Amino acid sequence: MESTRVFVSGLPPTLTNDQLKKHFETRFHVTDAHVLPKRRIGFVGFKSSEAAQQAVSYFNKTYMRMSKISVDIAKPIDAEPAHRKDSRTAQPDDALGNNLKRKRDGDTIKDSKTQEYLSLLQQPSKTRTWANDDQLPDPDETDSHAQEQEQPFDVDDQEELTYAQRKKAKLGQDANESSHVPVVAGYQPTTDESDGQPSPEKHEEELEDPQKDQAPVSDSDWLRSKTSRLLGLLDEDEQETFASPAAATNPTPIINSNVEKPEAESPEKPAESDLTKAPTAAEVDTNIENIRISARLFVRNLSYETKESELEPVFSPFGKIEEIHVAFDTRFTTSKGFAYVQYADPDAAVEAYRNLDGKIFQGRLLHILPASQKKTYKLDEHELSKLPLKKQKQIKRKQEAASSTFSWNSLYMNADAVMSSVAERIGVSKADLLDPTSSDAAVKQAHAETHVIQETKAYFKANGVNLDAFKQRERGNLAILVKNFSYGTKTEDLRKLFEPFGQITRLLMPPSGTIAIVAFARPDEAQKAFKSLAYRKLGDSILFLEKAPKDLFEADVPPQNPLPETKAVSQGFSTADTFAADEGDEEVMATATLFIKNLNFSTTNQSLIEAFRPLDGFVSARIKTKPDPKNPGQTLSMGFGFADFKTKAQAQAALAVMNGYTLDRHTLVVRASHKGMDAAEERRKEDTAKKIAARRTKIIIKNLPFQATKKDVRSLFGAYGQLRSVRVPKKFDRSARGFGFADFVSAREAENAMDALKNTHLLGRRLVLEFANEEAIDAEEEIQRIEKKVGEQLDRVKLQKLTGAGRKKFTVGAQDDES
């Protein structure tokens, strides 16, 4: 995951979060801004990583209030810091070396024999003869070597140590210094008479002045003790809280060397961070256990513009997600900055928690906590059993509306509304349209529904609806398909019904008035409307609601006013339309290569390319060559070549220009290139083309009503092309088996019938149409198919012999009876 957060240093001292955000918002959209004023650094979050990169390029080394700022991509929290040794670390090394050198010079001067030698070299008038008697051994000489051995860490090394290591070294140094203090004769520690422990009064006095009996420290140690290590990261109150445990744990000075030394801190104890205290293992285990119970995550510190669709790619790689809910503020129509993610598998939720907690998302650091289980309002089965059975089914169906899958297709329409719409359009009554004495009333209704569906598709496509989205099973969370309402329902009626639940962004109803699409601004509003209005009675019908497919709208196309004269796509096809597809295939298969002959034998590939390069669509050119028998390794031109172009039209234009062109004193002859084939190959190609054209002419009709006859199928499919044959298989009792076949003359007619009738209902059943299995184009493919079928049959026979061998009947003791 690329970082969407930038690090800004060198900020003005009095800069605030709002001012930093306002400065970066002059060019980019900012999701978060945080300033640490004491350190003059800050962090700025952006919506995408591209915006963060552009912000670094634009704002780096610019000025804010006379302060030059540096902008760089922020590193993750768990990134390891680069170990480098700067000049500040190198300077103490040199200083320490110089100090050691000066100490050696001083020691040399303090040496007794050296002083005696130097005194002899001085003039007699400057020599004090009485000074030799008063010289005493310097106590520093006896302790200098011991102090050098007892020093565990150098001054410059302590800057690279952690807080725990420096504290441990200090404790060891104090203990070593106390061990060299001479024992005072007659000294006894003050103890309490009751239990023999040291007196608390004396202990308190020692704690009040811990530095009283310690030896004087060096200048660097004194300066380090007066300098805060927090560098302004914490407030004053936090600094006092942070420093109080350290003051309480200071060791008391030890006077007698026989007294036991205080133990240093255990190295196994983890050091506390200067900024934040890491959660303990018990807390982490508690969070994980809570997540395993609910499989639900509470995600906070989100941007106020975050949507469910943006969170799904982040959390979906860890497992199947049942629901993502972003909390919205109804007063300001913006997000509250937190969301809930419900997983189907608890292990997936735990994995997401471990990998995403503290990560950067849209410029903010994610904070993930375990969430409680979602509240569900279950029905009381005891109270529900007291109601009538019909009422029980209605309540259960309404309760399960949000999670149930519908058996009808997305473009399902009320049959009565379809017939009413068609009857009103042609100016007849519905009774005249459906003649009770006619046997093809079901076919008429199917034709009417097909006409209305085609009209609805044309209207939706004109208003920016992606019709291919209806083929996918994944559903969105913003749009709702409203179906099964009575004919005559107006757009205003649906708007009044859905508006109380939220802001409606789109409301589309085709001229037929049999289906509608309602789109909301927020997912929670759409969910609330779906739960409240599912199976509600509207007029003399019941509303059927279905969640619209995902990515239903292609673009933000404004809805067009429905025109009364809007017509459906014409279903009539002429002979030219029928064979248009074949002509298009020939156009695609046509060559875009030119054959060039009468070339000069001295013409090279480079000269031929230079001649054809200025032409539009030129790709390459080459001269056909052969090996030179007299000069091995060399080639000879054969006097012709080829030139390739991108399209056939460009090749035709080049042919008209270059035919008759003079190149190297030779007039070029340019023709369209054709691959040479023998008679058998040409015949094979023709047969293959015929089989390809005829392989998609047969349609298998599934979910066919048992009452449908062969005549009904012919009447329904015959309106879209000329049928070669219609077959409806029957059982032994002459009843239909529920499927049929329709074979068209051309593949274009079969495709048109498939596209028009794939959402049509016949006698209340939706027709499921598929192309029948294609016949083998090549004889080799047919042979392989037959061999595979025979092999499967032989395997079944062998399996039957193996499993049936142990089922033979046998008589126990038959031989004994015969004897």
Curated annotation (Swiss-Prot):
Role description: Involved in pre-rRNA processing.
Alphabetical list of CDD domains matching this protein: RRM1_MRD1 (cd12565), RRM3_MRD1 (cd12568), RRM4_MRD1 (cd12319), RRM5_MRD1 (cd12570)
Organism, as annotated: Emericella nidulans (strain FGSC A4 / ATCC 38163 / CBS 112.46 / NRRL 194 / M139) (Aspergillus nidulans)
Protein's UniProt keywords contain Ribonucleoprotein: yes
Composition skew (Polar residues), residue ranges: 115-132, 247-259
Protein name in UniProt: Multiple RNA-binding domain-containing protein 1
Coiled coil: none
One Pfam family from the record: RRM_1
Domain RRM: 4-76, 295-373, 478-550, 592-675, 697-774
Gene: mrd1
Basic and acidic residues composition bias: residue spans: 104-114, 200-212, 260-275
InterPro entries per record: Mrd1_RRM3 (IPR034482), Nucleotide-bd_a/b_plait_sf (IPR012677), RBD_domain_sf (IPR035979), RRM_dom (IPR000504), RRM_dom_euk (IPR003954)
GO terms of molecular function: mRNA binding; rRNA primary transcript binding
UniProtKB keywords: Nucleus, Repeat, Ribonucleoprotein, RNA-binding, rRNA processing
Main location: nucleus
